[in-house]
């Protein structure tokens, strides 16, 4: 994917003694000491990263980490102290007021935590507000607003007022209003934080559905790690105005960059994050369109296994061949496809470990990991699933758990 946003050495210091504060932060002095000695606050310091087009990029950190400041620097709601903000190779940090206004109106839209709806305007009028300030003709803006509301399943409520809607529905209106402008970039600041957990999850689902349809570039600020892991393609974790690590959820969980990140993610429920693709192992296969029983048995002996995944010439998954079945087929002069087990569990690469557990628990054979076209991508065994859930797994622990399950 092409790079949509590129940030170079972006810094924001609030206060008057900026040079002194910069010198102190360069020496590694903590944020609270800089504030105490200079009265200046380090918002963001020397930040560098790229965001790809069509990516959901989540910025997270504790309160005061600089995540919301960083978001507002992107559209210059907060002016940077130094650094560059490239959007499609144009440095937004150097734009004059008029050009910046056009970027805010046409390239970016923002969704806030507090909804930001006008109480005296109907839902439709709220949704078309951004188009109205752009002087879009009334008929066109109404059509675009209605389409955005329809995409958010809110068209039936277009003539109601914000106070008549629940918090979740009001936030959906805010999202519809942002999308009505057809922006290339969505900036979302703690957009779902004020919602109840169930409604928040529904909004996350809706955002992912809209993203699948429209493929916007989304920068999403959150303090909720589970939310970030659920919706983010990549995550940036901040502390004291600095980015500690950028990576996928899997990268951050399995390879934290430092002790701070390790502590930050240690309580996350790994079963809700890790997928089959992360823990599958290469599949040992036999091609049932080519291999006979003797070839299958030779492969099993070489690999020291008692079964093989059965695939056809196209490598589409067909079942499992055990050593007993292959021996019987050789004795009776049968092809493998006549004796193999076809009732074998399959999972997608994207399936979460928490959803895999009940499937693999009683499965008589390993699970096949397949793509949307049925092509075999790997295999899951019970041990690999258990290992994925362990904080610090070792082979002895996995074997012990497996024995306990077998004895139940």
From Swiss-Prot:
Query: What Gene3D superfamilies does the record point to?
Result: CBS-domain, P-loop containing nucleotide triphosphate hydrolases
Q: Which residue ranges does the record assign to the CBS domain?
A: 280-336, 340-397
Q: Name the enzyme group at the top EC level.
A: translocase
Q: Which reaction does it catalyse?
A: a quaternary ammonium(out) + ATP + H2O = a quaternary ammonium(in) + ADP + phosphate + H(+)
List, in alphabetical order, the Gene Ontology terms for molecular function in this entry.
ABC-type quaternary ammonium compound transporting activity; ATP binding; ATP hydrolysis activity
Give the residues the record marks as binding ATP.
61-68
Q: Taking every annotated instance into account, which residue ranges of this chain make up the domain ABC transporter?
A: 5-265
The superkingdom listed in its UniProt entry is Bacteria
Pfam families named in the record: ABC_tran (PF00005), CBS (PF00571)
Q: In the Enzyme Commission scheme, what number(s) does this protein have?
A: 7.6.2.9
Matches recorded under InterPro entries: AAA+_ATPase (IPR003593), ABC_osmolyte_uptake_ATP-bind (IPR051921), ABC_transporter-like_ATP-bd (IPR003439), ABC_transporter-like_CS (IPR017871), CBS_dom (IPR000644), CBS_dom_sf (IPR046342), Gly-betaine_transp_ATP-bd (IPR005892), P-loop_NTPase (IPR027417)
Its biological function? Involved in a multicomponent binding-protein-dependent transport system for glycine betaine. Probably responsible for energy coupling to the transport system.
The record's listing under NCBIfam families reads: proV
Q: Which family does it belong to?
A: Belongs to the ABC transporter superfamily.
Q: How is this protein named in the record?
A: Glycine betaine transport ATP-binding protein OpuAA
């Amino acid at each position: 994917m092409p790079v949509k946003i590129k940030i170079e050495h972006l810094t924001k210091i609030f206060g008057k003694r900026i040079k002194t504060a910069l010198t102190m932060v360069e020496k590694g002095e903590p944020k609270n000491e800089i504030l105490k000695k200079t009265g200046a606050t380090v918002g963001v310091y020397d930040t560098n990263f790229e965001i790809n087009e069509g990516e959901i990029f989540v910025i997270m950190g504790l309160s005061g980490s600089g995540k919301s400041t960083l978001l507002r620097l992107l559209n210059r709601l907060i002016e940077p102290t130094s650094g560059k903000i490239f959007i499609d190779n144009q440095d937004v940090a150097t734009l004059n007021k008029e050009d910046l206004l056009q970027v805010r109106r046409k390239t970016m839209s923002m969704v806030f935590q507090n909804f930001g709806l006008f109480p005296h305007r109907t839902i439709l009028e709220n949704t078309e507000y951004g188009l109205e300030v752009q002087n879009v003709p009334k008929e066109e803006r109404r059509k675009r607003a209605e389409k955005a509301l329809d995409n958010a399943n809110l068209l039936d409520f277009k003539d109601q007022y914000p106070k008549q809607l629940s918090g979740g529905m009001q936030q959906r209106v805010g999202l519809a209003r942002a999308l009505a402008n057809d922006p290339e970039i969505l900036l979302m600041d703690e957009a779902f934080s004020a919602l109840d957990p169930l409604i928040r999850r529904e909004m996350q689902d809706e955002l992912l559905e809209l993203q699948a349809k429209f493929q916007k570039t989304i920068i999403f600020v959150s303090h909720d790690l589970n939310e970030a892991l659920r919706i983010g393609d990549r995550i940036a974790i901040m502390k004291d105005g600095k980015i500690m690590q950028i990576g996928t959820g899997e990268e951050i969980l399995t390879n934290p960059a430092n002790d701070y990140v390790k502590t930050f993610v240690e309580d996350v429920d790994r079963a809700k994050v890790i997928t089959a693709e992360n823990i599958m192992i290469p599949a040992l296969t036999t091609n049932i369109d080519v291999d006979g029983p003797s070839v299958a048995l030779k492969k099993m002996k070489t690999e020291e296994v008692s079964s093989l995944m059965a695939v056809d010439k196209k490598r589409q998954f067909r079942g499992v061949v055990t050593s007993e079945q292959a021996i019987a087929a050789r004795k009776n002069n049968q092809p493998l496809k006549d004796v193999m087990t076809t009732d074998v569990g399959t999972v997608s690469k994207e399936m979460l470990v928490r959803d895999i557990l009940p499937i693999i628990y009683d499965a008589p054979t390993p699970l096949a990991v397949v793509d949307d076209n049925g092509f075999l991508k790997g295999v899951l065994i019970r041990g690999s699933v258990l290992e994925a859930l362990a904080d610090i797994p070792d082979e002895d622990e996995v074997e012990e758990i497996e024995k306990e399950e077998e004895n139940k």
